A protein has these predicted regions:
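A generic structural micro-feature
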Residues: 39, 54-56, 92, 141
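Alpha-helical membrane-targeting segments
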Residues: 2-44
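Short, well-ordered beta-strand micro-motif
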Residues: 46, 148-150
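Residues that flank catalytic or metal-binding motifs in active/ligand-binding sites
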Residues: 43, 60, 94-96, 145
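Short, structured beta-strand-loop surface elements
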Residues: 78-132, 139-143, 151
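Short beta-strand segments
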Residues: 42-77
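Short helix-to-loop capping/linker segments positioned immediately adjacent to catalytic or ligand/cofactor-binding
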Residues: 34-35, 133-137
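Basic, alpha-helical terminal appendages of large translation-related enzymes
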Residues: 1-2, 147
């Protein structure tokens, strides 16, 4: 299913201040690269999107979960905050301008938002591989979007 903006929540975990996130992002990327693209026991990919409002390219490290068919699942969790992460809004605005870097290789990807049974299967995989994600629905009342990224 194409990407569509999911409703935001009315409650959630406290978000990181925007300025702190902007200042820390380049440092976090360097640290993650040195740790072989892993963080907290999870594999990462570097997601590049085009800003929904700014039009500027943005790259963020995101936990990735192999879909078993050569693609990856990513969860727009934002740690269980009431709002989706900025990268999700960027994808909604520009779904045809998304790329990833995995294991040093960059490629453009097609993005599908999962729903129904596909979403449930992916969510089960995510929680099995990264149990901390299972706590996020307790923090927020929004459904956490799960996106499948497939090499184009």
């Amino acid at each position: 299913m194409p990407v569509r903006k999911s409703p935001e929540g009315t409650r959630g975990a406290r978000p990181m201040p925007r300025l702190a996130g902007k200042l820390l992002q380049p440092l976090m990327i360097r640290i993650h690269r040195r740790s072989k693209d892993r963080f907290g026991g999870m594999n990462l990919l570097y997601l590049t999107t085009v800003g929904a409002r700014s039009g500027e390219r943005r790259t963020v490290p995101v936990a990735r979960f192999d879909d078993g068919a050569g693609g990856w699942y990513v969860v727009a969790s934002a740690g269980g905050t009431a709002r989706h992460p900025a990268w999700y809004y960027n994808i909604v605005a520009h779904p045809d301008q998304v790329s990833v870097e995995v294991a040093g290789t960059s490629r453009r990807v097609e993005v599908d938002q999962l729903e129904g049974e596909d979403r449930e299967r992916a969510w089960d995989l995510v929680v099995r591989e990264a149990p901390r994600f299972g706590t996020y629905p307790e923090k927020t009342d929004r459904e956490l979007p799960i996106l499948r990224l497939t090499p184009a």
